[in-house]
């Protein structure tokens, strides 16, 4: 065989081997990641062979070969941010904390620090409040509403406190919370809500699986903990709230183990039917609305406009449309790519929707 023919033969052979290796690596990566494909940020940025090699090396030498595309860590300093709560499942301990978000850029780990201050009553700091406020603005919701990823002074609740210095803005929100938690909070604070006060209730379509503590929700917690807090030892005392309809179709609340490790059968169980989840969610909203005669401003942050839960609202509930589609500009920033929560631009966008609503409520 002549040299040119040999060169062509070996080139074709090498190409076939590379294609076979790429196909094999792709199959390997699919088998490893099939349970979390939907949660991945997008298409891979590197050949499957390199990704498979990195995955294999990370198994042999844990932590030595992190994937730059998916490497994210979060640390709360000091430890002890969360505490048990018999009704809510968990709550925040008072104190001043640093939320540290880490990621990889150009092969190096970098981090961003956010200051988080929790008041003695468990609310997040929103700024200087008058001792005798003319009215209170109660804000309830999840990690987006709480302001995961941003400093105390960057949350939309802080911006509202600055805009309305005569009011007292009280931020009752926390990561992982939903309307089930909001109902418990409303039962605790309802006697403090006076005529003229404002209640802001966060909502996103993903709240619904939290309401019923769906198995898919617990599996997402499992995967998130494994990727973001790999060094944290799971505690069997960690619990999440669950709303359900009892045998008489009445709303009931309880708590269940947060981690699949301690109830694997539940995590592997069937998902509740969508219409049941919607019914539970609607009952939660009705119960929250019944806690006060004051208007509740439902801050719709994410999800479809035709969400069944947003139909036939209680008389004292009014939607504040604040999804990304409700803005004429791109406002869905994040924490410099180190976290998916809304950054300062997102919080200002929420503030811009709520400010006129609160002004109108005062008139």
Question: How would you describe each model-predicted region?
Answer:
Residues 123-125, 182-190, 283-285:
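Alpha-helical scaffolding within the catalytic cores
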Residues 179, 183, 278, 282, ...:
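Short, amphipathic alpha-helical "lid/cap" segments that border enzyme active or binding sites
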Residues 146-224:
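Conserved SGNH/GDSL esterase-like catalytic core that processes O-acyl groups on lipids
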Residues 37-159, 327-329:
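Membrane/wall-proximal cationic-aromatic binding patches
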Residues 2-3, 7-10, 25-29, 334-363:
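Histidine-centered active-site loop/cap adjacent to the catalytic His
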Residues 18-37:
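Membrane-interface motif at the C-terminal end of an N-terminal transmembrane signal
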Residues 36, 40-54, 60, 204-314, ...:
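Serine-dependent acyl-ester chemistry module
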